[in-house]
Amino acid sequence: VLLDSGMSPKLAWNGIFASQQRGYEKGLHDLFGFIAKNDAKYHLGSTPLQVYEKWSQKVAREAGVRPTVLPPNAKIGDLPPGLEFAGQPGADIMTATGPLRVQAEFLSQKIQQPNAVQVSSPLLGMTRLLVPIPAQWDAFAKHLNGSEPMDAEQSDPEALRKEQESLAQAMNMQNLIVCNENTVPGNPLLYPSYLWANFVSADPFTLINSLYGSGAGCGGRAPVTGQAPLDGSKLATKPLQIQATGDPQTPYQYHTSLSKPMQSRVVTVHGPGHAHFASQNKVVDDIGVHYLRTGEVTTTDAPGLI
C-alpha cells in the first residue's frame, strides 16, 4: 500500500478545508519564491513580493480587480526607493500592512467596476490549480512572463456548456461526499471570512476553505457516515507513506494521524507540492518502485522537486 500525501482522518472534512487556507497561501508564496529565485530566467522580480505584484497586475487586467490572497512577506529589496535605510524593520511593516493594503486596493477598484469579479481571471484560476504541482511551475512562470503561454484552445460554445455542467456536477458530488462523511464541526469564527469571500471578494484561495471550514457548506446537514476505522497492524507489509513539508492540500503537520494507526513508514519529501509519486521526482519514484517490488523502505527523507 502506497499512501501518497495522506490526509488526517481526524480532520475530515471541514478541518481539511480549514487547514488548506494557510497551506495554499504558503504554497503560493513558495511558487513566487521559486520564480524570484530564478529571476535571471523569468525576469518577473527578485523577491516573492515583486513577483506577486507582477502577477496581481495581470490578474487585474483580466478581471478588472486585483486578487486579495495574502501577499508574501516583504524583504529589504521591496522597500521603495529612498527608504532602504529602514532595513528589515521597514520590510516587516510592509508585511504587516500587506493584507490591509491589497483589500483596500481591491475595494477601490471594485467601486469603480462593481461588476468586476476576480475569479473571472483565467490566470487566477490557473494559479490556484497549479500551486500544488511544482512540476508545472516552470511552465507557469513562462506563461506569466508571456514567453510561452499555456492558454488552452478556445472551446466551441457547446463544449464549453458541457464543461460547465461537468464542473457543477463535480462540485455537487464533492458537497455530498464532504457533508455525508464530515466528522469535524464547523468553526463559527470562520463565518466572517466566508461571508466576505462569498459576497464581496470572491477570493478562490479563501472561498471554498471558509465555506466548509465554517460549516456553511453543509447547511446544518448531519453526516450520514462516521470516521472509517484505520488499522494497519494486520498488514504483512506496512504501508509506504509519502508526505511533503510544503504540501498545501494535506499539510505535513497532520500526517501522523494517518501514519500511526496505519503503522506507515513515512518518507518526508522536503519541498512543496501535493502527490509526489509519478510526478517527475525521480528520487521519490525510485523509492516507490523499490517498495512496490520488494516491500522495503530504506530511507526516511527525499528532496523535493523544487
Label each residue range with its predicted role.
Residues H255-H274:
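C-terminal soluble interaction/assembly domains
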Residues M7, I133, T245, P272:
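Residue-level signal for short, function-critical loop segments
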Residues A135, T294-I306:
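Alpha/beta-hydrolase-fold serine-hydrolase catalytic core, especially in secreted/extracellular enzymes
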Residues P248-Q253:
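Conserved alpha/beta-hydrolase "acid-adjacent" motif
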Residues W55-S233:
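Alpha/beta-hydrolase fold active-site neighborhood
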Residues L2-V51:
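A catalytic-pocket lid/entrance helix-loop region that shapes and gates access to the active site
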Residues K234-L235, L240-Q243:
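Short beta-strand/loop motif that positions the catalytic acidic residue
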Residues P272-D285:
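Catalytic histidine-centered segment of alpha/beta-hydrolase-like enzymes
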